[in-house]
Structures are given as C-alpha cells and as structure tokens.
Amino acid sequence: MFTLTSYFGFLLAALTITFVLFIGLNKIRLI
C-alpha cells in the first residue's frame, strides 16, 4: 500500500514538473 502511494505521488510530481516545463518553454517561445 505504501509503495503504491509513493509511486502515485512520484508520478504526480513528474507530471507537474513536465507541465511546468512545457508552459515555461511556451512562454519563452512566445517572447
């Protein structure tokens, strides 16, 4: 159970970081 929760948290963090990087690249491209 703990491994599943930690895995889900890691996946959520990875998705958030990717989303932030994608938005950052789009902003740089707009400028």
Swiss-Prot record:
The chain crosses the membrane at residues 4-24. One of its GO terms (biological process) is photosynthesis. GO terms for cellular component: chloroplast thylakoid membrane; cytochrome b6f complex. It is found in: Plastid, Chloroplast thylakoid membrane. It is a single-pass membrane protein. Keywords: Chloroplast, Electron transport, Membrane, Photosynthesis, Plastid, Thylakoid, Transmembrane, Transmembrane helix, Transport. GO terms for molecular function: electron transporter, transferring electrons within cytochrome b6/f complex of photosystem II activity. The keyword Transport applies. InterPro entries: Cyt_b6/f_cplx_su6. Belongs to the PetL family. Component of the cytochrome b6-f complex, which mediates electron transfer between photosystem II (PSII) and photosystem I (PSI), cyclic electron flow around PSI, and state transitions. PetL is important for photoautotrophic growth as well as for electron transfer efficiency and stability of the cytochrome b6-f complex. The 4 large subunits of the cytochrome b6-f complex are cytochrome b6, subunit IV (17 kDa polypeptide, PetD), cytochrome f and the Rieske protein, while the 4 small subunits are PetG, PetL, PetM and PetN. The complex functions as a dimer. This is Cytochrome b6-f complex subunit 6. The lineage of its organism: Eukaryota, Viridiplantae, Streptophyta, Embryophyta, Tracheophyta.
